[in-house]
Amino acid sequence: TSIANPNEDAHFVRPKPSFARDLRRAEVFVTTGLDLELWVPALLDRAGNSDVLEGGQGYITAYTGVELLDVPVAADRSRGDVHIFGNPHLTTDPLRTIQVARNITVGLKRVAPDRATHFDAGLAAFTDRVHRRLFGDRLIDLLGGQTLERLALQGRLYEFFGTQEFDGKPLIEELGGWLGTAEPFRGQQLIC
């Protein structure tokens, strides 16, 4: 069951009694955390299910371990609506989505340890799919997804490409996937 549907703004979900009923029976509750879903604590309290309350074995926080972006130095209304803990829109970045998937996997294994192998296999398949779509098959086969992910998260991916060659050509020529498609726009100012 999903409380916040993909076509809804998670900031403004209107809790309904049926949500509390669903949470009363739930084994797992996944929250983005931070200050995205300010309606969550009241809903969890109303449900009265200790397994999905913060600290319960079925409570999963998506943002754990994700480097937060846009953390304000000071929160005030002069900049409009500001997320005081940083940008909670984690799944707009494929690499941050992988960390969210890792967090969900940890939580699922906590609730159903007998299915850990299944959850790990799903995470591995998802991670490989994202890596291949982001970097392209060739670079994944050459360097491995974890290496490329680490370099990208450290902001060193293009620096690395600038110092490496493969078959006498700059390594960046092997870049495929979404980043390869977007390469002509790198360094350009875009207005969307």
Locate the predicted segments by residue.
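Extracytoplasmic metal-acquisition and chelation regions
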Residues: 1-192
